[in-house]
Amino acid sequence: MSQSLIVALDFPGKQDVEQFLRHFEGEELFVKVGMELFYKEGPAIITYLKEKGHKIFLDLKLHDIPNTVKSAMRSLASLDVDMVNVHAAGGSSMMKAAIEGLEEGKQEGKERPICIAVTQLTSTSEAMMKKEIGIEKTLEEAVAHYAKLTKESGLDGVVCSTLEVPKLREVCGDEFVTVTPGIRLASDDVNDQVRVATPKRARELGSSYIVVGRSITKAENPLEAYKTVKQQWEGVTV
């Protein structure tokens, strides 16, 4: 299950990434590259990480008209990334176009990247969703609606809170991928995410993948922190 632990490389540039990865010589990680790092370094950072043997979740949360998303996904698939995402709010046509682009752009002999959709950001509270976004549903209802739309559109799963996983299993089935950010060790601050959980709790609730950032990247000893998270996630008693 260690490959289902994704480390968020939330750094401003390649130099910071290189410094961080020195702690992990010989480890093949599954890493997340987000907007800040990708927009600074471009596709070269993907090439660098692939050459190091790491799997990559390219977290750009595409949300645009279908043709634009299709073309963008074609380009991203050609980079040999392992996972990408879109905003479910972009609608079914956009999500279907994303899959088409990934199929067209994937490298010969390889499967297309896993494609998931963001239902609601983990920084979104129900009050914010209703007052600012204008969705007159409960947060649980809105997430379930987007997850169902995502599955019907042919995507593999969603980004969601761990707390939403059991409901989404009911709505979309056990094969539906759930990628859960907002994972913290019990001793950590929650920072800017409202809906958070520990690795142990994520495992108990049935998450497919967990995304862990600051608990590892800001630790005094990142490798030891990684091992701690991994043990909790895998249910290993030491």
From Swiss-Prot:
UniProt binding sites for substrate: 10, 32, 59-68, 122, 184, 193, 213-214
GO molecular function term, any single one: orotidine-5'-phosphate decarboxylase activity
Catalytic reaction annotation: orotidine 5'-phosphate + H(+) = UMP + CO2
Superkingdom to which the source organism belongs: Bacteria
GO biological process annotation, one example: 'de novo' UMP biosynthetic process
Keyword field contains Transferase: no
Family stated for the protein in its record: Belongs to the OMP decarboxylase family. Type 1 subfamily.
Function according to Swiss-Prot or TrEMBL: Catalyzes the decarboxylation of orotidine 5'-monophosphate (OMP) to uridine 5'-monophosphate (UMP).
Oligomeric and partner information: Homodimer.
Protein name as catalogued: Orotidine 5'-phosphate decarboxylase
Gene expressing this chain: pyrF
